[in-house]
Amino acid sequence: MWLCALALASLAACTAWGHPSAPPVVDTVHGKVLGKFVSLEGFAQPVAVFLGVPFAKPPLGSLRFAPPQPAESWSHVKNTTSYPPMCSQDAVSGHMLSELFTNRKENIPLKFSEDCLYLNIYTPADLTKRGRLPVMVWIHGGGLMVGGASTYDGLALSAHENVVVVTIQYRLGIWGFFSTGDEHSRGNWGHLDQVAALRWVQDNIANFGGDPGSVTIFGESAGGQSVSILLLSPLTKNLFHRAISESGVALLSSLFRKNTKSLAEKIAIEAGCKTTTSAVMVHCLRQKTEEELMEVTLKMKFMALDLVGDPKENTAFLTTVIDGVLLPKAPAEILAEKKYNMLPYMVGINQQEFGWIIPMQMLGYPLSEGKLDQKTATELLWKSYPIVNVSKELTPVATEKYLGGTDDPVKKKDLFLDMLADLLFGVPSVNVARHHRDAGAPTYMYEYRYRPSFSSDMRPKTVIGDHGDEIFSVLGAPFLKEGATEEEIKLSKMVMKYWANFARNGNPNGEGLPQWPAYDYKEGYLQIGATTQAAQKLKDKEVAFWTELWAKEAARPRETEHIEL
């Protein structure tokens, strides 16, 4: 990747390719924006890149814990050629996620701010003509707590597949998901930011050569969960036309909570606020500085496994909630009722979702010895309650089912990681895909089974298809980073083609690609990796086991609580 303005070596190429002499300027409903042209090796047509375009008013002051408002207009030409700050978050976790997940050659310097409602645009369109290219809007992951748009470079996907790529930001953590469970702070602010960004795309993307009638939303982890939530929301009708969830769906128990009041009170107490009423808490928290809320975030120890406290009292994430606006009911209820946006939907998981990044780098599981006995596994499953929601009574049954077939403590550890991967991602993803299929929406599933050469040296060589691995293929990392293998380059070309075909037609299949079966009652899906082939019934046995276990638990008579009169 070269910037013509910076890289002398590419000057000749710039001239030869007829590189536009003036940088691109595009009209938006709020004012003009100035971008820059960036060339990708092997492509005659440069990509116009616009970084840090505001899609909403800065969510400061009285707009903290409030729905996003339209951006204010400007009369000058706004320079949108530098990366916007990422939304406020724990800087250490934010840096780590960016380092591990970026598809760039080197990570960009990260800044953080509460003023963060910006998006980046990559368009290969000839801006002198009114093109109508498919638009792909990327929603980043990070547990709704960390992450940012600029970690992910849309250049390769845009150039290779002739699509407009938009990467968006949304409020995170306390700023994005603080909820009192009533009208004082309903919550889901980060999801409402995502909706605002999609509205902005509808109003403006035509001027960037994009087709507002062909918008695909795609995201990974909490970004995949967000895509799935947006499909279920009445607010998003006609804002997008296809959807892709990579390793994250609306049924992730870790990212959804029904009762929010107790967590709101914990946050308020930690911030030194009174908790007499919701109004008092919200008023007090709005007066706090960004730094003070950051201190609260760090003290709350989100995104960490607590081995000491009562798992039922612990909180790993601030989450999506039922706010009556974005989500009228719980995701499971909306899915069961089949009343939501019936759009072509692709859902996928990776082979070892709980392989290394989540347990070792993010949540800090005590597994560095590389082995595990059954008793410890059962205890760890119970300590994982905040993210997997398995009751204490079920933990020995579950560990026996997964780990009982071997005495080898190394195998037991691997099987424990498989169990957590199924609970966190595998089972919810298959269940969501089945719901969409049953509702009549065209549905596709995949399992990604490949280890990118860009993986961290700290990661065990045996972990293939870890959480986030598919991003390197989807966003064309082999064309941006150095040192990719030939196999990896081919794989990324194929994956980008599948994803862009889906964005164009609602069907990933195309000439020269292995046939990807629709996810119908035969439950065909695609295994993507060094060998890419169709298979059937992804996680079928695991889903059956957990469904039966939870049904038995639900049918058990609850112990009646003694009520003092």
Swiss-Prot record:
<dbReference type="InterPro" id="IPR019819">
    <property type="entry name" value="Carboxylesterase_B_CS"/>
</dbReference>
<feature type="disulfide bond">
    <location>
        <begin position="273"/>
        <end position="284"/>
    </location>
</feature>
<keyword id="KW-0378">Hydrolase</keyword>
<feature type="active site" description="Charge relay system">
    <location>
        <position position="353"/>
    </location>
</feature>
<keyword id="KW-0719">Serine esterase</keyword>
<comment type="subunit">
    <text>Monomer.</text>
</comment>
<dbReference type="Pfam" id="PF00135">
    <property type="entry name" value="COesterase"/>
</dbReference>
<dbReference type="GO" id="GO:0005788">
    <property type="term" value="C:endoplasmic reticulum lumen"/>
</dbReference>
<feature type="glycosylation site" description="N-linked (GlcNAc...) asparagine">
    <location>
        <position position="389"/>
    </location>
</feature>
<comment type="function">
    <text>Involved in the detoxification of xenobiotics and in the activation of ester and amide prodrugs.</text>
</comment>
<dbReference type="InterPro" id="IPR002018">
    <property type="entry name" value="CarbesteraseB"/>
</dbReference>
<feature type="active site" description="Charge relay system">
    <location>
        <position position="467"/>
    </location>
</feature>
<feature type="disulfide bond">
    <location>
        <begin position="87"/>
        <end position="116"/>
    </location>
</feature>
<keyword id="KW-0256">Endoplasmic reticulum</keyword>
<feature type="short sequence motif" description="Prevents secretion from ER">
    <location>
        <position position="565"/>
    </location>
</feature>
<keyword id="KW-0732">Signal</keyword>
<protein>
    <recommendedName>
        <fullName>Liver carboxylesterase 1</fullName>
        <ecNumber>3.1.1.1</ecNumber>
    </recommendedName>
</protein>
<dbReference type="InterPro" id="IPR050309">
    <property type="entry name" value="Type-B_Carboxylest/Lipase"/>
</dbReference>
<dbReference type="InterPro" id="IPR029058">
    <property type="entry name" value="AB_hydrolase_fold"/>
</dbReference>
<comment type="similarity">
    <text>Belongs to the type-B carboxylesterase/lipase family.</text>
</comment>
<keyword id="KW-1015">Disulfide bond</keyword>
<feature type="glycosylation site" description="N-linked (GlcNAc...) asparagine">
    <location>
        <position position="79"/>
    </location>
</feature>
<feature type="active site" description="Acyl-ester intermediate">
    <location>
        <position position="221"/>
    </location>
</feature>
<dbReference type="InterPro" id="IPR019826">
    <property type="entry name" value="Carboxylesterase_B_AS"/>
</dbReference>
<feature type="signal peptide">
    <location>
        <begin position="1"/>
        <end position="18"/>
    </location>
</feature>
<dbReference type="GO" id="GO:0106435">
    <property type="term" value="F:carboxylesterase activity"/>
</dbReference>
<keyword id="KW-0325">Glycoprotein</keyword>
